Amino acid sequence: MLRTTVRTLRQRAFFHRSFVHVNLPELHSAIQDAQTTCYCQSINARLPSTTDPLDPQIKLPHRTPNYNKHVLLVSPGDKLAQPWKIAWNHNLDTNLNRPYNAIGKLRSYLRNSPGILINAVHLQNEFVPRPKEGDKWLFFFVIPDMKLYKIRETDLEEFASFLDEGVVQAPRLSFQDYLIGKAKVPQETQQVHHKNLTKFQGDIFLRDWSLVCGHYKRDAKCGEMGPDIIAAFQDEKLLTDNNLGLISHVGGHVFAGNVIFYKLFKAENALNKLDSLWFGKVYPHNLKLLCENLENGKIIDEMYRGGISMN
């Protein structure tokens, strides 16, 4: 049995669902610690000499970016391809190759809109269509729209305006600021005015998401652990109805094992309300425990980075 923690985290009040925060019991923690030590040693044996080793003793910060939308550029190729290891360079903003050059362009058009995260994703199942190699269309999945948009490269600037439409309360802290550590500074919000464009319709795909960081050239720890965690999802048949994918850098590569869950709230009503839950120090041997508790409305604090609700 897991025991309920008495500690209250600030994010709890903002979820659409009610989650209970729990801690691992001491006996289970001892077993987990032994498994973690063994696994980290095996990962470190695979790492290049230039990569800092995986240290399971690093403290996990309870911190995530504050954002309004998550834009995922879908990588081409089937699930056996390895763009996360080969095509995703250290900084995708500087990638000059299609389709990844679209990330830097889109981010430049959104430079005054810090509440939008942009990542590449390599899908590991077939619920959402993926582009073919050399496809003329760019495939973007946008959360919480829960829509797949097929965009021409010449329409990227207009698409950026579309993503940024309306009047929203956008956080001053950008995702890039978050990645370099500025999230430690208290942030205010500002009202941002945008164009109103309705050109882009998109196709709706209402499913939860499980995203695992596997950005090898950003940090080999994530690049080695990401596929192991994906294999654990598949071998243990965990959250099989979720979209599953490897995602580019989302911070936290120092401790690695980063997993993001997007959980829809009353999806049958097409409300597009969902909870964003970020975890770190997730290993193949503790993934099942994490997922089973999450499905029962319980968050394991030892792996919890933070989260927000989205509409």
Curated annotation (Swiss-Prot):
PANTHER family referenced in this protein's UniProt entry, alphabetically: ACTIN PATCHES DISTAL PROTEIN 1, ALTERED INHERITANCE OF MITOCHONDRIA PROTEIN 32
One Pfam family in the UniProt entry: Suc_Fer-like
The protein's name in its UniProt record: Altered inheritance of mitochondria protein 32
Protein species of origin: Saccharomyces kudriavzevii (strain ATCC MYA-4449 / AS 2.2408 / CBS 8840 / NBRC 1802 / NCYC 2889) (Yeast)
Family membership: Belongs to the AIM32 family.
